[in-house]
Every structure is written in C-alpha cells, then in structure tokens.
Amino acid sequence: GSITTAKLANGSVTSGKLASGAVSVDANTMPVGSILQVQTAKFTQQHNMNSNSFGDKGYTIQITPNFSNSKIILTCYLHFQLFRSDQESSWMVRIRKNGSTLKDMNSYHYYEAHPSYQSRVVHRANMPITYLDTAGGTSQITYDFYLGTGHGSSNSNQIATSKWQEDLFTAMEI
C-alpha cells in the first residue's frame, strides 16, 4: 500500500527509520554543478627523476562515478625542485585514465637561468594542475600522473618532488 503525507506527522520519519539505500537521488533533480563526491590522496615520498621519458612514480587516485555523464575534475599540487648543471631545465607530466593517456604536458614547467649562472640551475616551486574529464561509465576510474624531465636524461638534469611538502591530489565528481 501507499502512505500519504496526510497520515504522517511532521518529523515522524527520520533517517534512522529508513533502510540503507531506501532513498535515491535522480541526476535530473540535482542542480547543475553539484558536487557528488570528492576523493583525495597525498604523497610524501620523495621521487628523483632524470629521464626524458614519462615514468610511474606511484601518483594514483581512484574514483567510482555515480553517473556515466558526470564530469570529473582532477586537481593536483606537486611540490618540486628542478636542478640542471646547465642553462635550462624543465619537467613533464602525463595524466592517464585506466592505463590510457589523457593529456601530455611536455616541458610543463620551464626554467632558464641567467647566462652568468649557467653552472647550476636550481628552482623550487609548487605546480597546480587542473584537468576536466567525463566519467564515461560508472566503474571505478584510476587516474595516474607520470612524470619526467624535458631536457635530456642524465644526472645533470634532475627533478625531485616532495622535497619539503606533501603532494596533494583530488578527484571531484560533479
């Protein structure tokens, strides 16, 4: 049978009286831009890179979307130090989704020293990245961030992450 609101006293039904999953939300009733969930990850391990190819450093975040047409906003804050015993240095970031490349950012952060200081380039900073993706399904999504250097592959061109602060990653479903 059905119960009409005329037979229920105001405030008589509380969340404790409802079975888990008894109430669902239709995507069409949610206001545009509603945040459905937020997943976060932080990494404190230092990584040193001296290769001009992308490498897996364990930067991973996972999210299971509620709707296939949801947007996923990825943000990450990498804290890094560039070093090169020459005039310039840079580094690269690759964002992957379930093992496939979404976006390559070659020479994402580029630093060049004044010619009189060519013997050594050191630059410390943080790097924010934001990327907008479409879920494309409701199965768990794994996002990986691969890193590398953009100017050569030797110990004279190095990048170190988490030198003094943790690296933070967020996946937000809207």
Annotate each language-model stretch with its function.
Residues 1-50, 54-57:
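Fibrous stalk/shaft segments of extracellular and virion attachment machinery
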Residues 42, 47-53, 65-140, 144-174:
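Terminal beta-strand-rich extracellular "head" domains
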Residues 59-63:
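Extended, low-complexity regulatory regions
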